[in-house]
């Protein structure tokens, strides 16, 4: 699995086996970001259930200004941090361009961010999807994680 476009194109992403972790394929990310086009430029990304970080890292590689990654599994988040370091180095981005939050997504969404995000990736594990779906969207809206021009992508 690799970054499919932008400054870090071709950089490999590591993965760790964990229940429910199914990284987005390179082909799917490439199609998605091709359809988004320049809308990713200078955006603030929120990558929920980040896993390997492939969505947020793809966005950073393609010109997003910042990505916040939320992953509750500590072991998975360690691999995520390694992936972030590799992409930031390859794309010549500062470490401040990425932030990792090791926390349950629903608990995080009870807070209110300093600023809303322009691009939100929502890719929960399949086994949690039915339990989370309504709560996730409600909290994203209620607690101002999004604004009227935000783009929310749910897989």
Locate the predicted segments by residue.
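Class I S-adenosyl-L-methionine-dependent methyltransferase catalytic core
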Residues: 1-155
